[in-house]
Swiss-Prot record:
Protein location: Virion
Molecular function GO terms recorded: hydrolase activity
Name used for this protein in its record: Uncharacterized protein C129R
UniProt similarity note: Belongs to the asfivirus C129R family.
The protein's Enzyme Commission number: 3.1.4.-
Role played: Plays a role in the inhibition of type I interferon signaling pathway. Mechanistically, specifically interacts with 2',3'-cGAMP and cleaves it via its phosphodiesterase activity. In turn, prevents 2',3'-cGAMP interaction with host ER-resident STING1 leading to inhibition of downstream signaling pathway and type I interferon production.
Catalytic EC class: hydrolase
Species annotation: African swine fever virus (isolate Pig/Kenya/KEN-50/1950) (ASFV)
Top-level taxon in the UniProt lineage: Viruses
Disulfide feature: none
GO biological process, one term: symbiont-mediated suppression of host innate immune response
Primary site of residence: virion
Key words of the record: Host-virus interaction, Hydrolase, Inhibition of host innate immune response by virus, Inhibition of host interferon signaling pathway by virus, Interferon antiviral system evasion, Viral immunoevasion, Virion
Length: 129
């Protein structure tokens, strides 16, 4: 059963993708359990996604085995409205993941180091003149 699509304006999509990182396709298989993802289908339909339940996941779809990502809308499997669904990698054009605290710390440290490096380059350039 396919979930009915909710249409989001480009502005709403942009807002929902704040703090999410576009993941290159060759790294999709490394997105771990519990990570929240959002994605665009190959038909360019924006989906708000869910939490990774299994990834990669070998799904049989129309008698064909496909590599997929299995998602859920919550961690409480007994909660009313809890659903899981499978999305084959081939049906995804763009996949975004919400980084955890470790990744945010790494990103912040890299940005600080890059800023310091840029300052050093500017200082050296000024001395050369």
């Amino acid at each position: 059963m396919e979930h009915p699509s909710t249409n989001y304006t480009p502005e709403q999509q942009h807002e929902k993708l704040k703090h999410y990182i576009l993941i290159p396709r060759h790294l999709w298989c490394y997105i771990k359990y519990g990570t929240h993802v959002r994605y665009y289908t190959t038909q360019n339909v924006f989906r708000v996604g869910g939490f990774v339940l299994q990834n990669p996941y070998e799904a049989v779809i129309k008698n064909e085995v496909k590599t997929a990502i299995r998602l859920q809308n919550s961690f409480n499997t007994k909660a009313k409205g809890h659903v899981t669904w499978t999305v084959p990698y081939d049906d995804i054009s763009k996949l975004y993941a919400k980084p955890d605290a470790i990744m945010l710390t790494i990103q912040e440290n890299v940005e600080k180091a890059l800023h310091a490096l840029n300052q050093n380059v500017l200082t050296l350039a000024a001395k050369i003149r």
